[in-house]
Amino acid sequence: MSKRDYYDVLGVNRDASDDDIKKAYRKLAMKYHPDRNPDSKEAEDKFKEVKEAYEILSDSQKRGAYDQFGHAGVDPQAGMGGGGQGFGGFGDFADIFSDIFGGGRGGSGGGRSNVYRGADLRYNMEITLEEAARGCEKQIRIPSHESCSTCNGTGAKPGTQPKTCATCGGHGQVRMSQGFFSIQQTCPTCHGTGKQITDPCGSCHGAGQKKTTKTLNVKIPAGVDEGDRIRLGGEGEPGQNGGPAGDLYVVTHIKQHAVFQRDGMDLHCEMPISFSTAALGGEVEIPTLDGMAKVKISPETQSGRVYRLRGKGVKAVRGAEYGDLHCHVVVETPVKLTERQKELLREFEAISQGDVATHNPRSKSFMDKLRDFFE
């Protein structure tokens, strides 16, 4: 049986924010929770489906893989809770209800401190169109945290050890009842660590971490576009209680270019030409990302005509193909004419007999007569 689309399961759009996804999950989790629907196999199945969808879409890395490859891009078992958690495998539901009833983030029990993955970080990077097209390497500095070297991250004064929390017995969670619900929430005394620091470290004041700034080199691949994300694994916030660090996502923003407008792999630009070149044809030079290039202009060219230079666009991020450069003709009206130029134009106007130019290049028009005149 094929799985439903995770966005459809939660009833949200594909561009839904993290908050929208969490709100949708809260609502559906409360609606289908087994405690509210005893002996209902359908509600239980719905609850499992909602939970699985949330665990994928609430994780930025899994969500990205799902958006790109669908169900095949994520672990088929992702989001299906194991034993040992509150509600027989529905641990995330306990986390949501802990938020509702005032608790912090929960975790699994089992007589050990909770282990948390570090938070993901986002860095907005502005680059030029040339840098985006060719690729580049940038150095960035980001605020971060590092383990305290004085206490080795324990938060306790050197020579002492944290004590087992008396409130939760070292589990990091306490059980509470709210009406007909019985849920687990993070211990308010130790905040989920299962330990109490009675003699804190003087360097980090018991936090186990210190604020710092780190410098990273980021390789920008050729072909990146506006809003693309580059993942730097393990460069986010450090985890808690031995948990893994989060990731850093560098989001690219392309500066507006003075000449080119980008459309995916293709580039567009205006190509001004004189009205005599438009009528008679000729050759003009235009800028590209690789330098100047010559374009042969056909006779009777009208404003708005587009000349395409194949392979002069932006390289694909994956693969070796390139986009094209589309040059949009703009026929320029001459200014600051000499008396001789004005005389020639008056003569041309006279032999034109007041005919009005047409934009159909196949008809005998203004452009035809202009070409005949100059020839």
UniProtKB/Swiss-Prot annotation:
CXXCXGXG motif repeats by residue range: 148-155, 165-172, 187-194, 201-208
Gene3D superfamilies: DnaJ domain, Heat shock protein DnaJ, cysteine-rich domain, Urease metallochaperone UreE, N-terminal domain
Molecular-function GO term, any one: unfolded protein binding
ZnF CR-type: positions: 135-213
Domain J: 5-70
One of the GO BP terms on file: response to heat
Domain of life, per lineage: Bacteria
Binding site for Zn(2+) 1: C148, C151, C201, C204
Keyword Transport: no
One Pfam family per UniProt: DnaJ_C
Binding site residues for Zn(2+) 2: C165, C168, C187, C190
Assembly mode: Homodimer.
Domain commentary: The J domain is necessary and sufficient to stimulate DnaK ATPase activity. Zinc center 1 plays an important role in the autonomous, DnaK-independent chaperone activity of DnaJ. Zinc center 2 is essential for interaction with DnaK and for DnaJ activity.
Similarity section: Belongs to the DnaJ family.
Summary of the function given for this chain in its UniProt record: Participates actively in the response to hyperosmotic and heat shock by preventing the aggregation of stress-denatured proteins and by disaggregating proteins, also in an autonomous, DnaK-independent fashion. Unfolded proteins bind initially to DnaJ; upon interaction with the DnaJ-bound protein, DnaK hydrolyzes its bound ATP, resulting in the formation of a stable complex. GrpE releases ADP from DnaK; ATP binding to DnaK triggers the release of the substrate protein, thus completing the reaction cycle.
Protein name: Chaperone protein DnaJ
Species of origin: Chromobacterium violaceum (strain ATCC 12472 / DSM 30191 / JCM 1249 / CCUG 213 / NBRC 12614 / NCIMB 9131 / NCTC 9757 / MK)
Taxonomic lineage: Bacteria, Pseudomonadati, Pseudomonadota, Betaproteobacteria, Neisseriales
UniProt gene name: dnaJ
